[in-house]
């Protein structure tokens, strides 16, 4: 009888696998405080609702390259762009030393300007986030190891402080499936404790993590690109996230907290829809 070969729970670049075992990545979720919480049966049902609602939030990939290239070839990892002068990449030597140049990078719910390029490609989230080719960290490695990014091509040469920072970063790597659970738990707990239970507020483009996909992403997975200078399209996307997913991107969060009375009034109808979404979820969590 032939043996059944199960798909791997997580796939890592070979260089990254040399410094962290895949089994360790699978257990890293317990490094997050969200997994110190033991939800009761009603909260578990509410978490399932949040998880589904957030899986309907598109991923995004911002690019400074010609969008027609991505529409033809998909999102290509930097390792495959060595001789391609028509593409743009922000990959550093430290990324390469960890094999991250074999990954394509996305954000979740960050359909707004991020400084990574003029065009944003929305990408269907569910199949990609839940695939074994996805790993996630809460932030870009550059944010904690910026002084090492461009001059470190061998992680064995890191000084003591660099090694400490790298080890802390490695502890945050989780599979996409676990990241979805972490964010769902974070959102529900925050909304349970918040005075304002109308919307889950995001404050930066990286609040929902840096998504790393091993290998290229097919052009079939990409939606039409958005020009960040097209304010009407951007704003309609933000309102859609508010109304259908109960989430405020950082631009909407700033308008709600620091905007004019006129700005807040314009958002009220969308905010009411978001409040109803969360009210249903919180009611499920509070049942006894």
Label for each model-derived stretch:
Residues 7-105, 110-288:
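Active-site-proximal loop/hinge segments that shape catalytic or ion-binding/gating pockets
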């Amino acid at each position: 009888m032939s043996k059944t070969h199960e798909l791997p729970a997580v796939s890592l670049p070979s260089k990254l696998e040399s410094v962290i075992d895949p089994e360790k990545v699978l257990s890293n979720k317990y490094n997050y405080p969200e997994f110190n919480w033991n939800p009761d049966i009603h909260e578990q049902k509410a978490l399932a609702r949040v998880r589904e609602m957030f899986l309907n939030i598109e991923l995004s990939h911002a690019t400074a390259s010609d969008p027609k290239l991505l529409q033809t070839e998909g999102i290509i990892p930097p390792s495959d762009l060595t001789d391609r002068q028509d593409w743009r990449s922000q990959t550093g030597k430290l990324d390469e030393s960890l094999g991250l140049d074999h990954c394509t990078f996305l954000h979740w719910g960050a359909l707004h300007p991020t400084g990574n390029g003029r065009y944003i490609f929305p990408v269907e989230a569910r199949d990609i986030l839940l695939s074994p080719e996805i790993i996630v960290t809460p932030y870009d490695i550059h944010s904690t190891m910026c002084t090492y990014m461009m001059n470190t091509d061998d992680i064995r040469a890191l000084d003591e402080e660099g090694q400490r920072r790298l080890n802390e970063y490695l502890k945050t790597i989780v599979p996409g499936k676990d990241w979805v659970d972490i964010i769902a738990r974070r959102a529900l707990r925050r909304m349970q404790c918040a005075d304002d239970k109308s919307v889950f507020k995001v404050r930066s483009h990286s609040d929902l993590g840096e998504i790393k996909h091993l290998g290229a992403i097919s052009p079939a997975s990409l939606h039409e690109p958005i020009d960040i200078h097209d304010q009407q399209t951007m704003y309609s996307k933000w309102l859609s996230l508010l109304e259908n997913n109960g989430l405020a991107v950082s631009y909407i969060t700033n308008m709600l907290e620091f905007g004019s009375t006129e700005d807040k009034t314009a958002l009220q109808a969308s905010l009411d829809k978001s409040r109803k979404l969360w009210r249903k979820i919180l009611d499920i969590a509070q049942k006894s």
